[in-house]
Amino acid sequence: MDQMSPDNINGVILAVSSSIFIGSSFIIKKKGLKKAGASGVRAGEGGYGYLKEPWWWAGMITMIVGEVANFAAYAFAPAILVTPLGALSIIFSAVLAHFILKEKLHMFGILGCILCVVGSTTIVLHAPHEQKIESVKQIWQLAIEPGFLVYSAVIVIVVAILIFYYEPRYGKTHMIVYVGICSLMGSLTVMSVKAVAIAIKLTFSGTNQFKYFNTWIFILVVATCCILQINYLNKALDTFNTAVISPVYYVMFTTFTIIASMIMFKDWASQSGLKIATELCGFVTILSGTFLLHKTKDMGNSASGRGSISMPTRDTPVFTNSGSGRSSSSDKVAS
């Protein structure tokens, strides 16, 4: 194992801080969505009453702080290192949901959290070093290579189909629609965020990158994708259980981001097969943890007041909401 570079260490510190804030923001925002939904049209039904709810804004501010830290992390470390550390936000989200929203975290959920930590640590210790970037134009050349252009086109087409065809029909019953939109757009967001973060870093170092039109195109992509992600993430949070949204969103978002980073930045080009395999094992470990969190989400929430365990059955829909968001047992939480 090579010694971690100073830039990678800075990236890890920022990414972990980001996870704490972002994981907390899920819970704070959902509390705001619940309070707003109790007195008006819910976000899942197209309402925007949450914009008047202080709890929702507190959650947004917390998320912004986390995203700023995450943004800065991409200026120092490769996406393959920074993005998987988002698993830590799942832990904070699940634990806070247990205590604040009363969305119970079973012992297998705790095991899932531990697996996420182990997998994240494995990736941190074996992550590739960031390639040297001297200008935003260098990133632009990577972005307009045929491979990444094809990837971007496929993402845009799939997202358009999800928004205009599947969301009106299945959005309220199939979580994968909302989460899919957020995750797919998120992979493009991360690539653009990394470009903007590096541009800011280089500008503060004395080389102004904002004189290039390329930088402003990356900023436009970030703004557009973020607006879409916030809108559909709000709908997902208002309709489905937070403890389910967080891990599934993480898995999809991280998978597509790693694919995008491999295509655009070719992060693994300088690594040995053993290191790549170790990083993949770390990622699979994280996926196992998120799977446990998802599949055992209803354990300990049975009707028995003594906390008997209700095992999920084979017929339990994995990516659907069996009833309306208002009637879900996990959402019956006092404001």
Swiss-Prot record:
SUPFAM superfamilies from the xrefs?
Answer: Multidrug resistance efflux transporter EmrE (SSF103481)
Q: Where is the composition biased (Polar residues)?
A: 303-321
Q: Name the residue ranges with Low complexity bias.
A: 322-335
Give the Cytoplasmic membrane side ranges: 29-55, 101-104, 165-179, 234-244, 294-335
Q: Where in the cell is it found?
A: Cell membrane; Early endosome
Q: Which residues lie on this side of the membrane: Extracellular?
A: 1-7, 77-79, 126-143, 201-212, 266-272
Spell out the molecular function terms from Gene Ontology.
magnesium ion transmembrane transporter activity
Carries keyword Magnesium?
yes
Q: What is its main location?
A: membrane
Entry-linked Pfam families: Mg_trans_NIPA (PF05653)
An example GO CC term for this entry is: early endosome
Gene Ontology BP terms: magnesium ion transport
- UniProt keyword terms in alphabetical order: Cell membrane, Endosome, Ion transport, Magnesium, Membrane, Transmembrane, Transmembrane helix, Transport
The positions making up the signal sequence are none
Write down the InterPro entries for this protein, in alphabetical order: Mg_trans_NIPA (IPR008521)
Q: Does the keyword Cell membrane apply?
A: yes
Q: According to its record, how does it sit in the membrane?
A: Multi-pass membrane protein
Q: Where are the transmembrane segments?
A: 8-28, 56-76, 80-100, 105-125, 144-164, 180-200, 213-233, 245-265, 273-293
Q: Subunit arrangement?
A: Homodimer.
Q: Which PANTHER family match?
A: MAGNESIUM TRANSPORTER NIPA1-RELATED, PTHR12570
The similarity comment for this entry is: Belongs to the NIPA (TC 2.A.7) family.
In its UniProt entry, what is this protein called?
A: Probable magnesium transporter NIPA1
- Which species expresses this protein natively? Arabidopsis thaliana
Taxonomic path: Eukaryota, Viridiplantae, Streptophyta, Embryophyta, Tracheophyta
